[in-house]
């Protein structure tokens, strides 16, 4: 697992959450305990809204989720976890991108 190093040399594990709702407190505790995650990161509302509104019959999902990909690429570092759930095409594209960038997708 890859971590972001703090000034004191402590490694921080991060997890991005990419789906239509927030984790419950119990789910957040479970993630922190089971994966050692210290930081859970949600996208800004404008990115979150895109993930919530993808039509099931969308012709070009890649174009629709472009802002999601741009946001994630600008924040993702090697070995960050990314929890992904949603429309199949969106999930596939995001999982592929996370793998290519050295992240760890959970889907």
Question: Which sequence ranges carry the predicted segments?
Answer:
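Long, low-complexity, Lys/Arg-enriched
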Residues: 1-80, 96, 100-107
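N-terminal glycine-rich "phosphate-gripper" loop used for MgATP/nucleotide binding
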Residues: 83-89
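An aromatic- and histidine-rich active-site surface loop
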Residues: 89-95
């Amino acid at each position: 697992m890859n971590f972001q190093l703090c000034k004191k040399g402590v490694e921080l594990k991060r997890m991005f959450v990419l789906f239509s709702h927030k984790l419950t407190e119990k789910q957040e505790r479970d993630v922190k305990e089971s994966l050692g995650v210290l930081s859970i990161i949600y996208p800004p509302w404008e990115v979150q809204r895109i993930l919530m509104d993808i039509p099931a019959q969308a012709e070009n999902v890649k174009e629709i989720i472009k802002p999601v990909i741009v946001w994630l690429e600008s924040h993702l570092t090697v070995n960050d976890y990314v929890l992904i759930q949603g429309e199949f095409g969106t999930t596939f594209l995001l999982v592929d991108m996370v793998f290519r960038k050295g992240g760890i997708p959970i889907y």
